[in-house]
């Protein structure tokens, strides 16, 4: 019978390396922004608002992403940087992991638009921030950011909490306008700060916020990509 053995020293070192690796993974704590809200509120002015179809055509990339660690902020330009990972790409060639640039910082944020935090899921219409191909920002900031939410059955939706995109294009398939009870259900698993902001914005939005079923919007994106 042939037998092979690791020398005791090698076996011990291997076990130690595996233990350290497991400990390091378990010990990682998300890096969060110092505050989700700025010290003052700013009301942004935009040259135009985009429909979903217009934003898709104008974007360098469109993707469903998950926000990771807070990287830092640029107080001169009032922007904040986050790690982000692509979960599903609908247009463009985003790196699997990239830097997401959000308007707002610890000094100033827009009403009902808190800074992202680790775990936030988004559908974003992006442009290259600085030409590096590594940093991207939403075309008109919160106007082209849809939050990922889920209904009671676990089906995924993209929520236009400000109603600005849906107001420009009423013919997008899979569109629904949740009432307050449905909205509370959809944001039940969202972090409390964001859930409260969405609820507040929904009350202020005359047309109400709209949600799009993932499957219908993906088919719509596929059609837009062929144009």
Please place each PLM-identified region on the residue numbering.
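Short boundary/loop segments of OB/S1/cold-shock single-stranded nucleic-acid-binding domains
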Residues: 39-59
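Solvent-exposed loop/turn segments at secondary-structure junctions
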Residues: 71-73, 89-92, 105-108, 129-133
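Netrin-like (NTR/C345C) domain of secreted extracellular proteins
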Residues: 27-33, 110-227
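Sec-dependent signal peptide cleavage junction
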Residues: 21-42
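Beta-strand/loop nucleic-acid-binding surfaces
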Residues: 95-113
């Amino acid at each position: 019978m042939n037998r092979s053995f690791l020398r005791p020293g090698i076996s011990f070192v291997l076990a130690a390396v595996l233990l350290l690796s497991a400990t390091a993974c378990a010990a990682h704590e998300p890096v969060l922004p110092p505050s989700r809200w700025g010290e003052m509120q700013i009301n942004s002015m935009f040259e135009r608002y985009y429909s979903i179809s217009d934003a898709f055509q104008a974007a360098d990339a469109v993707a469903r992403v998950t926000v990771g660690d807070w990287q830092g902020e640029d107080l001169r330009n009032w922007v904040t940087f986050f790690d982000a990972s692509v979960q599903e790409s609908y247009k463009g060639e985003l790196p699997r992991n990239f830097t997401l640039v959000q308007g707002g910082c610890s000094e100033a944020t827009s009403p009902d638009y808190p800074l992202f935090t680790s775990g936030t899921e988004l559908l974003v219409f992006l442009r290259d921030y600085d030409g590096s191909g590594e940093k991207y920002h939403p075309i008109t900031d919160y106007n082209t950011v849809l939050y990922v939410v889920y209904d009671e059955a676990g089906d995924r939706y993209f929520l236009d909490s400000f109603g600005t995109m849906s107001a420009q294009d009423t013919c997008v398939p899979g569109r629904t306008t949740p009432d307050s009870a449905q909205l509370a259900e959809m944001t039940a698993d969202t972090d409390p700060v964001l859930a409260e902001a969405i609820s507040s914005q929904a009350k202020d939005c005359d047309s109400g916020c709209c949600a799009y079923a993932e499957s219908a919007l993906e088919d719509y994106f596929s059609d837009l990509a062929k144009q």
